[in-house]
Curated annotation (Swiss-Prot):
Organism lineage string: Viruses, Varidnaviria, Bamfordvirae, Nucleocytoviricota, Megaviricetes
Skewed-composition ranges (Basic residues): 443-463
Organism: Acanthamoeba polyphaga mimivirus (APMV)
The protein's name: Uncharacterized protein L537
Disordered as annotated region, ranges: 439-470
Length: 470
């Protein structure tokens, strides 16, 4: 194909809106340096969704950058590209702030004081976000390196700060240039843990768990690019106008830039820290294999069990949340779940639109234990137990599936929702996916009546109290 024809063909690929990530990853573009971005869009359900745009190279994207005002860097590799698991240390800080005008009117704070303020409704306390916030973060990063790493040149680190113009929250991104991890997911997770430990020992105005958003570090993670806005939102802009877009990105897309960047590996971690904080080798290999699994057509790589085991394990999850995922690739003890439609996450109950998940299968003397994990890393728990398969007859057993009628119990347990409000009789509409207390009681009464007629023992279900602050 002549060069001009290739360019015309590639332009047609770039003009295509891919609504599925896998379609973008496997798009038939003629390049080995493909660059993919995620763009925001409004879905038919009036939610914020995404579509993907594919460029022959990062350089081609830069020329068209202004045409994509709501774009995100997304950590995926096109099927033509070599696998890349490296990336810089990044942070996403989001702190909800309070309108200070009321506090100024009451005289609680000075009228000329424009510091962002946090209001804690539980303790009824007011906390000002320190003016030297950025310096505190940078100092903590340096202190983390001093305590837990070696042979890292701190003098060449560059802190690339950007700020959202949203007046309702304190929102900043930070990319640490010259702290370039060979294994971005594993090393970033470790650094976050160590950073949080140092922070909590030194600063008390906010806890690290409320400060650091660790969910951006995951397979197929993404981060809003500097210069982009959310739909109907506010732009993210550089604090220092001398910084450039390539400085702020997780990955390094120019070879000459990559060769100059300071690379940090497992060998830079102090030995006593590795066993205490670093994930197991199995977890690391799983993270590394995720992208490889998704980018190739081979369905099964190094399976640990017979294919029927993976099928039966999937059937357990599908009985709980039908038609949310389809079976993806198999790699060892892991089965990837490919999302078909949005749904609340089995692990955290948070609503996910795009993230895939996985099942982990471990074998004991008599059973196969099935656990669910989410690639959004949306919960403190790594995985949630789903059920088991009995070896031999492969009978399915799950605490979330009724033995008699096959109905599911996960997320359908009796829920008493107690809103912490000034009025006990305040009317509050619960979300559609949460049963009201009245409907639960009614349903329970009908089941008891039916059970008494059939003279079968009544199954007692547990009641969970949830307290929601309003």
């Amino acid at each position: 194909m002549a060069e001009d024809k290739i360019e015309a063909y590639n332009k047609s690929i770039t003009r295509t809106k891919y609504f599925k990530m896998d379609d973008a990853i496997n798009s038939p573009i003629c390049s080995k340096t493909v660059f993919i971005i995620a763009n925001e869009r409004i879905t038919k359900e009036n939610r914020i969704g995404r579509y993907y745009t594919v460029f022959p190279s990062f350089k081609k994207f830069l020329k068209k950058r202004d045409s994509y005002p709501q774009c995100h860097e997304i950590i995926i590799d096109h099927i033509n590209n070599k696998t890349n698991i490296a990336g810089r240390l990044v942070f996403d800080f989001d702190i909800k702030i309070t309108d200070s005008s009321i506090l100024k009117d009451t005289g609680l704070i000075d009228k000329n004081d424009n510091q962002p303020i946090m209001f804690n409704s539980k303790t009824l306390s007011i906390t000002k976000i320190p003016l030297n916030f950025k310096q505190q973060i940078e100092n903590t990063i340096i202190e983390t390196i001093d305590q837990y790493f070696h042979d890292i040149d701190k003098t060449i680190l560059e802190f690339i700060w950007s700020t959202s113009q949203n007046p309702n929250k304190f929102s900043k991104h930070l990319t640490v240039k010259n702290l370039y991890f060979d294994d971005w997911i594993t090393m970033s997770k470790l650094f976050y843990k160590l950073f949080c430990k140092v922070w909590d020992n030194q600063y008390y105005w906010i806890s690290s768990k409320d400060l650091v958003d660790s969910q951006i570090v995951r397979n197929k993670g993404s981060l809003r690019m500097v210069g982009s806005t959310k739909i109907n939102g506010y732009p993210l802009v550089f604090d220092n106008k001398n910084h450039t877009l390539p400085d702020s990105l997780i990955r390094i897309y120019f070879r000459n830039h990559r060769e100059k960047e300071q690379l940090v590996t497992r060998n830079n971690i102090n030995k006593d820290i590795i066993n205490q904080f670093l994930e197991s080798n199995d977890d690391i290999e799983h993270h590394r294999s995720i992208d490889i699994i998704d980018r190739h057509f081979t369905k099964i790589r190094n399976p640990s069990y017979d294919p029927i085991i993976y099928q039966k394990a999937f059937e357990i999850y599908d009985a709980i949340h039908p038609n949310i995922f389809k079976m993806g690739k198999v790699n060892g003890k892991y089965l990837t779940l490919i999302r078909l439609k949005p749904h609340t996450c089995f692990l955290s109950n948070k609503f996910h639109e795009q993230e895939n998940a996985y099942l982990y299968i471990s074998m004991s003397d008599t059973t196969y234990k099935i656990s669910f994990g989410c690639y959004r890393f949306c919960s403190k728990k790594k995985m949630e137990y789903l059920g088991s398969l009995i070896q031999g007859n492969l009978m399915k057993n799950s605490p979330y599936i009724d033995d008699t009628d096959g109905t599911t119990k996960k997320h359908d347990f009796n829920i008493n929702i107690k809103f912490l409000s000034d009025s006990d009789d305040e009317s509050i509409n619960a979300p559609n996916n949460i049963k009201s207390l009245e409907s639960i009681k009614s349903s329970k009464s009908k089941k008891q009546l039916k059970s008494s007629k059939s003279k079968k023992p009544i199954k007692h279900t547990k009641t969970k109290n949830i307290y929601v602050e309003t």
